[in-house]
From Swiss-Prot:
Keyword line: Activator, Cytoplasm, Repressor, RNA-binding, Translation regulation
GO annotation, biological process: mRNA catabolic process; negative regulation of translational initiation; positive regulation of translational initiation; regulation of carbohydrate metabolic process
PANTHER family: CARBON STORAGE REGULATOR
Subcellular localization, as worded in the UniProt entry: Cytoplasm
Annotated GO MF terms: mRNA 5'-UTR binding
Lineage of the species this protein comes from: Bacteria, Pseudomonadati, Pseudomonadota, Gammaproteobacteria, Alteromonadales
Xref: Pfam families: CsrA (PF02599)
Function: A key translational regulator that binds mRNA to regulate translation initiation and/or mRNA stability. Mediates global changes in gene expression, shifting from rapid growth to stress survival by linking envelope stress, the stringent response and the catabolite repression systems. Usually binds in the 5'-UTR; binding at or near the Shine-Dalgarno sequence prevents ribosome-binding, repressing translation, binding elsewhere in the 5'-UTR can activate translation and/or stabilize the mRNA. Its function is antagonized by small RNA(s).
Gene3D superfamilies: Translational regulator CsrA (2.60.40.4380)
Subunit structure: Homodimer; the beta-strands of each monomer intercalate to form a hydrophobic core, while the alpha-helices form wings that extend away from the core.
Predominant location category: cytoplasm
The keyword Repressor is assigned to this record: yes
Descriptive protein name: Translational regulator CsrA
Top-level taxon in the UniProt lineage: Bacteria
Amino acid sequence: MLILTRRVGETLMVGDEVTVTVLGVKGNQVRIGVNAPKEVSVHREEIYMRIQAEKNGQLAGHDSSSSDEDN
């Protein structure tokens, strides 16, 4: 894991097209802004994990329903 130190208003680059800017720090919370092309998905980790779980559930549900139709 790369660990960087940034101050409010400072930016880091991820590749050529994604920027992450520190917008503010209040207590133990850090506000960041992410600027990325539309084709790059940006999610909080808990949202990403929920999306993945839903995809896996839908795929599993779809597979079982299609096999039921074949019987």
